[in-house]
Amino acid sequence: MIYQANKRQFGALEGLAHWCAEYYYTLERLGADDAEMPAIRKDVSFCMDRCDALGVPYWAQNAALAWAENWRATKAEYFDAAMAKRGITCKGGATA
């Protein structure tokens, strides 16, 4: 599948990936009982709702989440390159 997002949609996907990576980083480093976990879960939920409101397909959201679950991958590969490998691009080029 191929999905060409506009800049707002692509930015929302990037935000979703960021908070997903933050969730797994915090989970690994500090555990599920860390005081920040409820706020991080709320941020992930907000980002998912934002993607839904902007019309981002679920498979594209899932691709961003699957990439960000391995938070180390977010340190080794740029988001736009990772999404391009999964058929997700941004109209007009990467967001700056």
Language-model regions, residue ranges each:
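Non-transmembrane, aqueous-exposed alpha-helical and coiled segments at domain scale
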Residues: 1-96
